[in-house]
């Protein structure tokens, strides 16, 4: 690792460039340099202060190894109460909501595409504004803990996965019905809930069967396991009760495995 300091010059290798998000509104270039100088010589700091949106920056090092060290050392770093998001920029910059339809509301959208790390500690977010990206959502949800995956869909919903279960639980308690702001300044109040067994899996396939139970008071309960696609024919397949006087209540329970 070489010495610190900002060296002004032509842009270098993209492997040397990192993205820094979730910065405080009063951040200065010198403040960013102070956070990253120990990782190596800095070629350039490009601070973006957008009206109505949180600032972010691109920091370019002389050596790609220093950039990698900075990502590992400063991602999630608490700076003046703000948990920094530090990562390598992703290629294929995109805008707007994803195309396509059906399923979970269309293809994913985002400025650089969602990260690939996944977790079972997942929440579903609804009520996102049209310009909200996965990065905006990830920044918002990181107030509750370490986010390892975030994605958004064109129907205004999103999915967020946390590293730890307690962070997921805290996110529902702290961030449900909070004000969300996109990188374009659009705001909306969002709802956050734990992804339950009946919620969309957003790309994770689940093998399911339907357990059908017929509960009859005064008679023996009957149960059968049938494929989910046959559930709609349920009433045609269940046996009728011979003596209606014995029936007090009849109910069907569908349990997705």
From Swiss-Prot:
CDD domains: RRM1_SRSF1, RRM2_SRSF1. InterPro entries: Nucleotide-bd_a/b_plait_sf (IPR012677), RBD_domain_sf (IPR035979), RRM_dom (IPR000504), RRT5_SRSF_SR (IPR050374), SRSF1_RRM1 (IPR034520), SRSF1_RRM2 (IPR029538). Residues 88-116 are annotated as: Disordered. Coiled coil: none annotated. Its main location: cytoplasm. It holds the Pfam family RRM_1. PROSITE patterns: RRM. GO terms for molecular function: mRNA binding. SUPFAM superfamilies: RNA-binding domain, RBD. Residues 93-108 have a biased composition (Gly residues). Keywords: Acetylation, Cytoplasm, mRNA processing, mRNA splicing, Nucleus, Repeat, RNA-binding. GO terms for biological process: alternative mRNA splicing, via spliceosome. It is found in: Cytoplasm; Nucleus speckle. GO terms for cellular component: cytoplasm; nuclear speck. Residues 16-91, 121-195 form the RRM domain. The modification N-acetylserine is found at residue 2. Belongs to the splicing factor SR family. May play a role in preventing exon skipping, ensuring the accuracy of splicing and regulating alternative splicing. This is Serine/arginine-rich splicing factor 1. It comes from Gallus gallus.
